[in-house]
From Swiss-Prot:
Biological process terms in GO annotation: L-proline biosynthetic process
Subcellular location: Cytoplasm
UniProt function note: Catalyzes the NADPH-dependent reduction of L-glutamate 5-phosphate into L-glutamate 5-semialdehyde and phosphate. The product spontaneously undergoes cyclization to form 1-pyrroline-5-carboxylate.
Protein name: Gamma-glutamyl phosphate reductase
Organism: Limosilactobacillus reuteri (strain DSM 20016) (Lactobacillus reuteri)
Reaction(s) catalysed (UniProt annotation): L-glutamate 5-semialdehyde + phosphate + NADP(+) = L-glutamyl 5-phosphate + NADPH + H(+)
Keywords: Amino-acid biosynthesis, Cytoplasm, NADP, Oxidoreductase, Proline biosynthesis
NCBIfam families per the UniProt record, alphabetical: PRK00197.1, proA
Pfam families recorded: Aldedh (PF00171)
Family membership noted in the UniProt record: Belongs to the gamma-glutamyl phosphate reductase family.
Length: 414
């Protein structure tokens, strides 16, 4: 095991022990100072980001969009920290309490997870969001970003650590692994003595690599092969507005819609309308045989398309015979992130919500709302697509666990 990595783990554990005892007022004051220091040092961050962007000129636009940092995005990061400071602190919160037949008082209390490892790709905002959420919830964080964002992440973490140091707070609450090799990532995934949970942030390949390699417990997040189903009873104007929003507003993010399913009864009427609306925004459509017959500019779909998260202005279209056919298709190909039905029939809408096996299931709303901020959680550390511990947008509450505190007055078990 890499000795530098072990040293990082030990420092993180030590910081986590201190953070677990830190009061809410101190944490909130620190977060506000972190936000101010990001703004104060924005030129340093942008200069570092320019180095990363210069090395990524051959990468697709969807990649550089996630990588790019400017004054507005730094302001957004800072505002995210301020929002977290305003949120309720779940640590030390008592979920419930009771007295047993033997007179023992039992309290179920929220406590931090400990040390959280984040493995992520080219999203510098993750560095700041993760630091804010882990710090407020009393956890230390070890960050390992992709090589494409190494200069930006290094600058961000340097500023965050210097801010903590100036406040006489544990600087090792946030640490960055600057070795971006796969070998060090694999060792991090197995640092069970020091890391309590791993959260991968990125595409499906990264997430699956972490899930299959790690011996540290993993919260699986966010690949988003998201679907919108237009029911036979849908308001077609609403359906058009929601579909365009879900696909076009920000196609590179995990809650953007990638697939459009349309009930056969309305396909001839609706598909030409939605195809025109999407194509006006530069969306390339790929469809099944029926879709291609209805709109000649739609390209034939392949089996691989149904399983693909495009993160781009591409959308696959399928015509289905029934609500159950739509549900079956979605449950087979979905990454269990976010799906939506557009319908005026509330019974069919509720049935869809119950039958779909995804973290977030909408009726008559865009999948783009799957977001910690939109849910009222503040910034999120990721969107969990698994069922154990946390599911959906993960805010402060999801970064804690429970502890039972039992108080007696001399009881012994008979």
């Amino acid at each position: 095991m890499n000795q530098d990595l072990i040293a990082i783990g030990k420092r993180a554990q030590n910081a986590a022990n201190k953070l677990a005892l830190m009061n809410t007022a101190t944490k909130n004051k620190a977060l506000l100072q972190l936000a101010d220091d990001l703004i104060k040092n924005k030129n340093q961050i942008i200069a570092a980001n320019q180095q990363d962007l210069a090395a990524a000129t051959q990468m697709p636009t969807k990649f550089t969009d996630r990588l790019m940092v400017n004054s507005q995005r730094i302001a957004d990061m800072a505002n995210g920290l301020r929002t977290i400071a305003d949120l309720n602190d779940p640590t030390s919160q008592i979920d419930k309490g009771w007295i047993t037949k033997d007179g023992l008082q039992i309290l179920q209390r929220r406590v931090p997870l400990g040390v959280i490892g984040i493995i992520f790709e080219a999203r510098p905002n993750v560095t700041v969001d993760a630091t804010g959420l882990t710090f407020k919830s009393g956890n230390a964080v070890i960050l390992r970003g992709g090589k494409e964002a190494i200069q930006t992440n290094t600058a961000l973490v340097k500023i965050l650590r210097e801010s903590l140091q100036s406040q006489h707070l544990p600087v090792d609450a946030v640490q960055l692994i600057t070795d971006t090799s796969h070998a060090i990532a694999d060792e991090m995934m197995n640092l069970t003595d020091y890391i309590d949970v791993l959260i991968p942030r990125g595409g499906r390949a990264l997430i699956q690599r972490v899930v299959t390699t790690a011996t540290v417990p993993v919260i699986e997040t966010g690949a988003g092969n998201c679907h919108i189903y237009i029911d036979k009873d849908a308001d077609l104007t609403m359906a058009t507005n929601i579909t365009v929003n879900a696909k076009v507003q920000r196609p590179s993010v995990c809650n953007a819609a990638e697939k459009l399913l349309i009930h056969r009864d309305i396909a001839a009427k609706f598909l030409p309308v939605i195809a025109k609306a999407l194509m006006e925004h530069g969306v390339q459509l790929r469809g099944d045989e029926t879709a291609c017959q209805l709109v000649s500019t739609i390209r034939p779909v392949t089996e691989e398309d149904w399983d693909t998260e495009y993160n781009d202005l591409i959308m696959a279209v399928k015509i289905v015979d029934s609500l159950d056919d739509a549900i079956s298709h979605i449950n087979h190909y979905s990454t269990h992130h976010s799906e939506s039905i557009i319908t005026n029939n509330i019974t069919r809408g509720r049935y869809f919500q119950q039958a779909i096996n995804s973290a977030c299931v909408y009726v008559n709303a865009s999948t783009r709302f799957t977001d910690g901020g939109e849910f009222g959680f503040g910034a999120e550390i990721g969107i969990s697509t698994q069922k154990l511990h946390a599911r959906g947008p993960m805010g402060l509450q999801q970064l804690t666990t429970i502890k039972y505190e039992i108080t007696g007055n001399g009881q012994i078990r008979k």
